[in-house]
Amino acid sequence: MLYEVDGSGRRTDHKATGNGEFADFPMVLLANGFSASASEILAGALQDYDRAPVIGDTTFGKGSVNILRRLENGGGLYLTFAKWFTPEGRPIEGTGIDPDIEVVSRDSQKADIDQLNKANETLESIVAGKGALGSARP
């Protein structure tokens, strides 16, 4: 499903397991600048596998793997020791995931409504059989 690369360049693959119960379930994914970390990993994987179009705005760009080390003096040290990449090798850290269908507005409430409307329209198109799931990409 995705992989991480640590500071020494070692790659670790992470694959999804299960019986694929919802493998053919039509879906879209809403995202914006507040979508970060695990939600970006999911968005990137769904895009790379043409499983669901991402609708909205570019995500936050938090694709690092971090750990907090407690120090003897009571302080702490926050360390980044790896970075996440999508299945196709796209970095998430600092760039985020760009949507397949961009829907943005300066008014966040309007943007939410517009994104929901576009998601509904796109999902109806997928369900109606007007192309494969990934065909919702521009």
Enumerate the language-model features and the residues they cover.
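Extracytoplasmic/secreted envelope proteins and their assembly/folding machinery
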Residues: 24-27, 39-43, 47, 52, ...
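C-terminal recognition in membrane/secretory proteostasis and scaffolding
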Residues: 4, 70, 103-138
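Gly/Ser/Thr-rich loop/hinge elements
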Residues: 1-37, 64-69, 85
